[in-house]
Amino acid sequence: MSTFLLEIGLEEVPAHLVTSSESQLVARTKEFLAAHRLTVGDIKPFSTPRRLALQLCDVAEESEALSEEKRGPSVERAKDENGEWSKAAQGFARGQGATPEAFEERDGYVWLTKHTTGVPANQILSQIGEEVVSQMKFTTYMKWANHSFLYVRPIRWLVALLDEQVINFNVLDIATGRVTRGHRFLSTEHVTISDAQAYEETLQSAYVLADAENRKAQIKSQLETIANRNHWVLSLDNAPAQDLLEEVNNIVEWPTAFSGSFDQKYLEVPDEVLITSMREHQRFFYVRDTTGKLLPHFLSVRNGDTAHLDNVIAGNEKVLVARLEDAEFFYREDQQKKIADYMAKVKTLVFHEKIGTVYEHMQRVGLLAEKLADALDFDDDKKTDLARAAEIYKFDLMTGMVGEFDELQGVMGEHYARLFGENERVATAIREHYMPTSANGNIAKSDVGAVLAIADKLDAIVTFFAANLIPSGSNDPYGLRRAATGVVRTLTTKHWHIALQPVLAEFMAATGTVTASADLMAVLSFVVDRVRKLALDDDIRQDIVSAGTDNFATADIVYLTDRIQVLANHAHDNNFREVISALTRVARLAEKTPVSLNVNPQLFENETEKALYAATSELQLVALEANGAEALYQALAALQMPISAYFDATMVNVDNEQIKNNRYAQLNIINQLIAGLGNLEDIVIK
């Protein structure tokens, strides 16, 4: 078995595109191999800032031979009245590259067996340039020279080897060969690869660690070694550290870790500022002592060896200190003003030209937060703190620190609020109102912060809808889907049952023209769509998600989420099919008549009507006392047998109008309760 090597040599690829490009190369190669029926063993990917590559191990000598049976016209159409092959038969044979003499007659049709012989591997692999390399798609492109061809970065060289043999093809004017490039500074410019299997070893001798996972492991090991030697605590398990490790891994080919320091005086600045300066701006890893206190040291990685490392450390320290000087200055200067001073400036800050200022947005948020607090029965202390938080929660946008480090908005608001004498609940809410900051980010823990976060996001959704700035397709420039997801996740995490429909209706009526033109049902549907998306992401069946969200009534997000989960949990019950069949039969019949809930037991004609009536009366009591969708499902499931018996013995559409309407009224009562679980007709019975 042979080994194939493909390497695409590039100018430096942005760090955030390297890993996804490597994955895409593997995926497209798998599709290519499947399309050409060429079997291989393992596929080993490689990537650095300057190259995307892969090795195909155990490549078959040729593609799999293929025999396909093709059915032609019927025997009757295949021959004319003289028994000769018809034009239809001859055309079919010609289209398959055969003659009618190769026909077989079977099952009333003529058949051809088409044999495709295997194609040598080197012949197939010569097409990988056109079918894989040239077809790669990226979120960022460049053009170079006079080519109209677009790629993530200009291609500078190509290597394609099947064992020792060069597989010839071109991409633009770049021909494949066996010459790669080593490290830009530590190696000679051109490095020859003798054999496809020698790729990784050859590059390592040229100061390139091509295996991204191996390179990352080495970086992690080097960082931990330095931290342990100095008795520092280095945390690499949290998401930001993992992201930084991935970024650093994708900007180096030969990693060498080192440590640096800064003056202890800068530790007077909040930790978040120092960490942001180190991690976000300089790609440094911060360290703490065993008590959790931030230390005046950092760890970093250079793309090179240990030569002149002292100069590298000094240069990095100098750049960091310049950042910290700015941070210290802004931190000191910001405290010279009061919150009222910053709020005066917020009044001039534009939220959106079609909507108004940030200050006006805050006023609406305060009103909506008050209505949400009423719905949640907040006590007076919480309401007071919520009102104060809503009054000032964007003040830090006008501080010098947030102007310099915009990713610290909310974080600095919390710090400054404490320094300016605001209580803990208000200060915490200022930071938490941005949460969650990502699809899977943390939810606000405090009740005041969570309500402020919900109100802030809902006002944005309503006002942007009113301004007809509604997301379409994948286009969502104002992050409204993310905001709606945050609303859903906050409500479900806190398990807050809030009927959004009446709350938002009252809010929109009170806030006038800026929200009046918003379509309330469109807004609610938009938020409920996020419930659907989150449920589908949890691998819940599409039909169950649809059933649970189609009828969202007052838009109690927690109840919608609960009933989706309840239906999903019971979908594996032995009697689920029977329960859903019985309930949907009731629903379909009830939909055919105007709703009437006046049932006269005196008009019952058989025992099954009486039994169903008694069971339904019990169900109504259970539904009134039920604490969630689970109790309602259990109560409705208990009706399955009475419903089945009822339909076995009872004809609903009888001639007697009085009896017929009485029976429909009984079904309508049950259907109103069924609607509490959603539109069960959406469920596919398996």
UniProtKB/Swiss-Prot annotation:
Pfam families: tRNA_synt_2f. Signal peptide: none annotated. GO terms for cellular component: cytosol. Residues 67-84 have a biased composition (Basic and acidic residues). SUPFAM superfamilies: HD-domain/PDEase-like. One of its GO terms (molecular function) is ATP binding. GO terms for biological process: glycyl-tRNA aminoacylation. It is an enzyme of class 6 (ligase). Keywords: Aminoacyl-tRNA synthetase, ATP-binding, Cytoplasm, Ligase, Nucleotide-binding, Protein biosynthesis. It is found in: Cytoplasm. Residues 65-99 are annotated as: Disordered. It catalyses: tRNA(Gly) + glycine + ATP = glycyl-tRNA(Gly) + AMP + diphosphate. Its EC number is 6.1.1.14. It comes from the Bacteria. Belongs to the class-II aminoacyl-tRNA synthetase family. NCBIfam families: glyS. Tetramer of two alpha and two beta subunits. This is Glycine--tRNA ligase beta subunit. The lineage of its organism: Bacteria, Bacillati, Bacillota, Bacilli, Lactobacillales.
